[in-house]
Amino acid sequence: MRVVRGCLLGLAVFQILSTLVGAVELLVAPQWFAPMLDHTAFAGQYLLAALLLGVVVGGFQWVAVLVHVRLRRWLPLGHALAGTVMVGWIAGECLVFDSFTWPHALWGGAGVLQLLLVLVLLGVLRALLGSTSFGSHPSPTPRDRWVMPSGPYGHGPA
C-alpha cells in the first residue's frame, strides 16, 4: 500500500502544479484562451476562470496533500474528493466547450486514476494472485482464483 499512497501523493502534486500553471496562464495570457471562452459564460471572465481552476480545483488537491501528510486517517476521503472535483471540472469543460481534446483526456484520466487508486487503497479493487490471464478454466489452486474484498463491506474472510 506504500506504493499506492506514493502514487496518490505524486498524482495530487502533479494536479496542483497543473492547475497552478493553468490559472497563471489564464491571468497572464488570456488571449490564448479567448477563442475557447468567448462563446461561454466565461467570456471576458478570465479572473473567475483562473480562480475556479487554481483555487477551487487546485485547492482540493492541496487539501488532499495536506490530509495525506498530516491526517492519514482521512487520506482516502481527501484524494477521493480531489479526484472527483478534477473529473467534474474536466467534464464541465468538455460540456461548456462542446469538445474533447488530449488535455481533457490527460487531466480527466489523472482524476479517474486518483479515484481508482483510492479504491485500491481501500481494498475494493485487488489484483489477481498468481494469475497472468483471464482463462475460462478454473484454477486448480485457491491462491490463483479471484480475491474477494474482505472486511465489513466485502464477502471474503475478514
Predicted regions and their residues:
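Topology signature of small-to-medium multi-pass alpha-helical membrane proteins
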Residues: 1-158
